[in-house]
Swiss-Prot record:
Disulphide connectivity of cysteines: none
Descriptive protein name: UPF0316 protein Bcer98_2136
Pfam name, any one: DUF2179
Single GO cellular component term: plasma membrane
Organism name: Bacillus cytotoxicus (strain DSM 22905 / CIP 110041 / 391-98 / NVH 391-98)
InterPro entries named in the record: DUF2179, DUF5698, UPF0316
Swiss-Prot/TrEMBL keywords: Cell membrane, Membrane, Transmembrane, Transmembrane helix
Keyword Membrane annotated: yes
Top-rank lineage group of the source organism: Bacteria
Cell compartments where the protein resides: Cell membrane
The keyword Hydrolase is annotated on this UniProt entry: no
Length: 181
């Protein structure tokens, strides 16, 4: 019974670690992923070693399976809380909506405004880049000012140049100055 509990706990730790490692790899953070992979490998070997010692012990096998499933739920929750990376939103508008553009820029979001041809009239599209951790804030601003806007989003794997890169460099330099003081 104690072994089954240990296996369950190890799986609840292992699967979120696996989830985080996978996300780091997808986000091209290979060094961090390698470090997390060390922990993942150790937990994997230990838990499977216990299960394979006695394959007739159904409690250990069930603990492994249920722990894996519970670990998936926990891993998804942790991933949402960490919100690693960046996201881009395309926001389609019927009018130019300078109020929305100004509000988003004042809040620190990178915004580019495009004018395009819709089926019946001119349409406007905003491309907005944000840290995933600020996605909810972004959505609240858009929904408050332009509740009828059409929105779609995707995650960014990498980017180069533009407003965000300059803003991040400024913040990094300011942090270094603050730490030096």
């Amino acid at each position: 019974m104690l072994q089954a509990l240990l296996i369950f706990v190890l799986q609840i730790i292992y699967v979120p670690v696996l989830t985080i490692r996978t996300i780091l790899l997808v986000k091209n953070q290979t060094r961090s992923a390698a470090g997390v992979g060390l922990l993942e490998g150790a937990i994997y070997i230990i838990s499977l070693g216990i299960v394979f010692q006695d394959l007739s012990n159904w409690m250990n096998i069930v603990a492994y399976i249920i722990g894996f499933s519970a670990g998936l739920l926990l891993g998804g929750y942790i991933e949402n809380k960490l919100a690693i990376g960046y996201i881009t939103y395309h926001v389609s508008l019927l009018d130019r909506c300078n109020e929305l553009v100004d509000e988003l820029r004042n809040a620190g979001f990178g915004v580019t405004l495009f004018e395009g041809e819709g089926i019946n009239s001119v349409r406007y599209r905003l491309d907005i880049v944000a840290k995933r951790s600020r996605e909810q804030e972004l959505l609240e601003i858009v929904n408050r000012i332009a509740p009828k806007a059409f929105m779609s989003s995707y995650e960014i794997r990498s980017f180069k140049g533009g407003y965000l890169t300059k803003a991040m460099k400024k913040r990094t330099l300011m942090k270094k100055k603050d730490h030096a003081s």
